[in-house]
């Protein structure tokens, strides 16, 4: 999965805006973070704790929770080596979480 794929997905999610902050992409729903770019191959995605645990167990090659995100409702996705469908589903889940859909 590429960052351009995420931009295309975000454009299809009602109310999600994309912008750059310090050169990195950031996607928000009414000001609430859905996901943001960490570097060229990783993004962090908003996620409930239950969903985060499920994703890490189900797709360990795709998702991780570094220590700095352990107390936060966030999960890191590996765009280069991860499962593109799982990442897409996680981003849609983040939008649903933030939008209440």
Where are these regions (language model features)?
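Charge-dense, helix-prone N-terminal extensions
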Residues: 1-101
């Amino acid at each position: 999965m590429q960052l351009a794929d995420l931009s295309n997905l975000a454009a299809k999610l009602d109310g999600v805006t994309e912008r750059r902050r310090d050169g990195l992409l950031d996607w928000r729903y009414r000001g609430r973070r859905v996901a943001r770019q960490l570097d060229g191959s990783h993004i962090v995605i908003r996620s409930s704790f239950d969903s985060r645990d499920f994703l890490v167990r189900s797709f360990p090659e795709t998702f991780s929770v570094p220590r700095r995100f352990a107390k936060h409702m966030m999960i890191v996705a590996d765009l280069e080596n991860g499962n593109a469908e799982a990442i897409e589903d996680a981003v849609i889940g983040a939008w649903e979480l933030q939008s209440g859909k």
